[in-house]
Amino acid sequence: MPEVDYRILILDLLRERGPAKTICPSEVLSDNDKQNPELMEEVRAAARTLASQQRIEITQRGKVVDPAQFKGPIRLRLKR
């Protein structure tokens, strides 16, 4: 099975939604994969990478958070 590049999937989904919208990291995964904590962590790691590259923002309760410091539920959006 080929390795999935979650960075591309995150960016594609965010571009599809538009600049004013956010996504939950779980939306990147298929329904079956959403229950796999290892895959969920891979998506969150991809989000951290994109945020550190200034391509997206990671938010909690509508506020941008440090990609290296967040814990708990997050949302992703294109960099404003």
Enumerate the predicted regions with their spans.
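Long, charged, low-complexity intrinsically disordered regions
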Residues: 1-3, 38, 80
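Short, cationic-aromatic polyanion-contact patches
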Residues: 61-80
